[in-house]
Amino acid sequence: MSFLGGLFGPVCEIDVILNDAESRKTAELKTEEGKLEKHYLFYDGESVSGKVNINVKQTSKRLEHQGIRIEFVGQIELFSDKSNTHEFVNLVKELALPGELTQNRSYDFEFMQVEKPYESYVGANVRLRYFLKVTIVRRLSDLVKEYDLIVHQLATYPDVNNSIKMEVGIEDCLHIEFEYNKSKYHLKDVIVGKIYFLLVRIKIQHMELQLIKKEMTGIGPSTTTETETVAKYEIMDGAPVKGESIPIRLFLAGYDLTPTMRDVNKKFSVRYFLNLVLVDEEDRRYFKQQEIVLWRKAPEKMRKRNFHQRYESPEPRPSLSAEQPEM
């Protein structure tokens, strides 16, 4: 995959080439438009180095400039206010002093052991991106080229990973016990559990397990929450009876998931919930939501390195909600 720059009319062409481009892995990330883009993959603490090649398009003309620089940028952009971006990382390397270009030039750059505290993310209302930015400073208008990188945040196995077990119900009508084998799952994991019916006095027609993603942006009263049902797993279709036990097995690998993100730079959060939904014969919906934590497992060869992520265990609140259908 070439690390190719863009064209700036007849003036020059800027190319950025990583030193390890041939061996470095790539990853995919969805754009705002929903298209998949492939970029080079980095982890926290890795250095970023390479060359900036500037190809002068018309060697008969001088390209005067006030300096050339490259930046490594980590940035959060809220789609509701694109004019107000927040940079949480900005490293600058000066490549050339003010002067002029009459022929092609190449400049080396290196950002040593760069801190990349968050995972790359594109959601419904927010984007967190990392990119290299080359700027040729000019009097009237700068020549700028940006190139995106993707960052993954790796984690070790959680020290504590308790199962989730609760009894919930509606008094004298429905009483069930459900259990999930863990509270924290890596992105390729399998959710294993079971549901046990202790009391059934309403006619249940359908039951499913949903994996729900909630993206929260903003602070306080200006917080916006975007909810997406990522996966649905049909547990049963028909009426259960007292004493019946139904197994659950939901494979996460086939879904587009990110790690759980909590209060990223005080701008946004991404959280995941398991939502148990029951529908009775009158189309009333009963549901119980339980938060889980998702994390990205380090590849086998990287697990000896000190990757670690703090986990916050969601606390269960044993209650079953009833949602009346619209009349």
From Swiss-Prot:
It is a peripheral membrane protein. Keywords: Cytoplasm, Endosome, Membrane, Protein transport, Transport. InterPro entries: Arrestin-like_C, Vps26-related. Residues 305-327 are annotated as: Disordered. Pfam families: Vps26 (PF03643). GO terms for biological process: intracellular protein transport; retrograde transport, endosome to Golgi. One of its GO terms (cellular component) is vesicle. It is found in: Cytoplasm; Endosome membrane; Early endosome. It comes from the Eukaryota. Acts as a component of the retromer cargo-selective complex (CSC). The CSC is believed to be the core functional component of retromer or respective retromer complex variants acting to prevent missorting of selected transmembrane cargo proteins into the lysosomal degradation pathway. Retromer mediates retrograde transport of cargo proteins from endosomes to the trans-Golgi network (TGN). Component of the heterotrimeric retromer cargo-selective complex (CSC) which is believed to associate with variable sorting nexins to form functionally distinct retromer complex variants. Belongs to the VPS26 family. PANTHER family: VACUOLAR PROTEIN SORTING 26 RELATED. This is Vacuolar protein sorting-associated protein 26A. The gene is vps26a.
